[in-house]
Each structure stands twice: as structure tokens, then as C-alpha cells.
């Protein structure tokens, strides 16, 4: 009985995080992924730094100096948050402009490649024709040798 319950629990708990094919979530843009990673990193640094500052203030040296670093750390954290909020739209605008410019370049490159393809196509056709003729000549030359070896 325990094995059945354990098996069902593992089955449902691991399957509950699965992504079904009918879910139509839009994929996250690279910029959103970078923003999320930076946010996670900054939050981790803030939390880790807060712990170290609290430990320092609790120590004898911290009590003796009475620097109140924890208050300064909180101020620094709120300043970083405000800065991130102010920089967000500017960086988003930068990435949007970059995407537009790269799209224009991509279209120009596609057009140029199509022109090159059209210019090169006659040469490729001529090469293929000559190649087929050469192969046919070699076949004709080798055919008597093949029949000779079979006999």
C-alpha cells in the first residue's frame, strides 16, 4: 500500500510541473530573461549582504563602531530598486530599436542574397551541365572495362 501511495505521489508531483502542448504561452524574449536573471542576482546580493551586515553589527567591533550599516544597506537597496525602475524603459527602448534595425538589415541581406543567387544561377546551371557531360563520358569509357571484368 505504501508503495502505491508513494508511486502515485511521485507521479502526480513530478507531473504537476509539466508543460502541456496545448498551453500557448508566449516564449520569453531574451531581454526579459536577462532582466529576470539580473533581478534574481541583485536580490540574492542584497539578501546576502544584509546577512553579513547584520552579523557585523552584532559583533563586538560592530557594536563598538556603531556605524548603523544595516540602515545604510536598506537605503542602498531602495536606491538600486529605484534605479532599476528608471533604467528599465530606456533599456527596453534600446532593445526595441536594436530589434527593428536588425530586422531591416536582415531584410536587406535577404534581398541581396536573392540577387546574388540570381546572378550565380546561370554559372551553377552551366557547371552542372558540364559535370553531367563529363560523368557521361567517363561512364562510356568505363563501360567496356566493366563488361570485360564481368566476363
UniProtKB/Swiss-Prot annotation:
Gene label: APOA1
UniProt xrefs under Pfam families: Apolipoprotein (PF01442)
Residues modified as Methionine sulfoxide: 109
Gene Ontology molecular-function annotations: cholesterol transfer activity; phosphatidylcholine-sterol O-acyltransferase activator activity; phospholipid binding; protein homodimerization activity
Region feature 4 X approximate tandem repeats, mapped onto this chain: 67-143
InterPro entries: ApoA_E (IPR000074), Apolipoprotein_A1/A4/E (IPR050163)
UniProt repeat feature Sequence, residue ranges: 67-88, 89-110, 111-121, 122-143
Family annotation (PANTHER family): APOLIPOPROTEIN, APOLIPOPROTEIN A-I
Gene Ontology CC terms: chylomicron; extracellular vesicle; high-density lipoprotein particle; low-density lipoprotein particle; very-low-density lipoprotein particle
The protein, known as: Apolipoprotein A-I
Swiss-Prot/TrEMBL keywords: Cholesterol metabolism, Glycoprotein, HDL, Lipid metabolism, Lipid transport, Lipoprotein, Oxidation, Palmitate, Phosphoprotein, Repeat, Secreted, Signal, Steroid metabolism, Sterol metabolism, Transport
Residue span(s) of the pro-peptide: 19-24
Gene Ontology biological-process annotations: acylglycerol homeostasis; cholesterol efflux; cholesterol metabolic process; lipoprotein metabolic process; phospholipid efflux; positive regulation of cholesterol efflux; positive regulation of phagocytosis; positive regulation of phospholipid efflux
Primary location: secreted
PTM summary: Glycosylated. Palmitoylated.
Family membership: Belongs to the apolipoprotein A1/A4/E family.
Oligomeric and partner information: Homodimer. Interacts with APOA1BP and CLU. Component of a sperm activating protein complex (SPAP), consisting of APOA1, an immunoglobulin heavy chain, an immunoglobulin light chain and albumin. Interacts with NDRG1. Interacts with SCGB3A2. Interacts with NAXE and YJEFN3.
Signal peptide per UniProt: 1-18
Record's subcellular location: Secreted
Tissue specificity remark: Major protein of plasma HDL, also found in chylomicrons.
Entry function: Participates in the reverse transport of cholesterol from tissues to the liver for excretion by promoting cholesterol efflux from tissues and by acting as a cofactor for the lecithin cholesterol acyltransferase (LCAT). As part of the SPAP complex, activates spermatozoa motility.
Coiled-coil regions listed: none
Origin superkingdom: Eukaryota
